Regions:
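A short glycine-rich, Lys/Arg-flanked "PGG" loop and its adjoining helix->strand segment in the class I
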Residues: 14-29
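A short His-aromatic
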Residues: 8-10
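Cationic, low-complexity basic patches in intrinsically disordered or flexible, solvent-exposed regions
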Residues: 165
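Short alpha-helix
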Residues: 64-79
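Conserved class I S-adenosyl-L-methionine
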Residues: 29-54
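A conserved beta-strand element that flanks and buttresses the S-adenosyl-L-methionine
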Residues: 2
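C-terminal helical/coil "lid" or tail adjacent to the Rossmann-like core of SAM-dependent
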Residues: 79, 84-137
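Core SAM-dependent methyltransferase catalytic element
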Residues: 79-81, 104-108, 147-162
Length: 165
């Protein structure tokens, strides 16, 4: 089974891993990349500041789960997987335009908590906070992505046999 940029949207992770385990045959592989610990950290801090000034708790609104490699390894192993490799990889990613379209798409859970007339001004405030951190010298917005990549297998059943005398 393969997953790309989806698992961090699915809750609770234990139920997701249980579903993957049930879908795989013994010996099957589970390979994925998802948001990892500190993924979009600057963006989340800026959203938290802007929403906090409006009386909203960004942490409660967040649709994401960005675990560390150690935390997700523990969940994979608890679900019965053998982890072959797991790592957190920084992956700064250039955005095709400014941060505002990214926020409107991926930050809807945050901005959608605001009344409609407040969304664009809040989005602009977030962009103002992020500009010194996420815009490079050429003027390109760079999202501070951090990915969690892993390969895990569902072990084959232990061979069962009856010893012959």
């Amino acid at each position: 089974m393969f997953s790309n940029a989806a698992l961090h949207w699915m809750h609770p992770p234990e139920a997701v891993l249980d579903g993957v385990r049930r879908a795989l045959k013994r010996g099957g592989r589970f390979v994925a990349e998802m948001g990892g610990h500190n993924n979009t950290a600057a963006i989340i801090v800026a959203l938290s500041a802007v929403l906090g000034r409006r009386g909203l708790d960004a942490h409660r609104l967040s649709p994401w789960y960005f675990p560390s490699a150690a935390a997700y390894r523990e969940k994979l192993e608890a679900a019965g997987f053998t982890v072959e490799d797991i790592r957190v990889v920084p992956r700064p990613t250039a955005l095709p335009t400014s941060i505002e379209p990214w926020l409107e798409t991926f930050g809807e859970a945050f901005l959608g908590a605001l009344p409609e007339p407040d969304r664009a001004p809040a989005c602009a405030e977030v962009a103002d906070l992020l500009r010194p951190v996420l815009v490079d010298e050429s003027g390109t917005w760079i999202a501070d992505y951090v990915r969690l990549r892993f390969r895990a297998t569902l072990p084959p059943r232990a061979a069962s046999f009856i010893a012959q005398p």
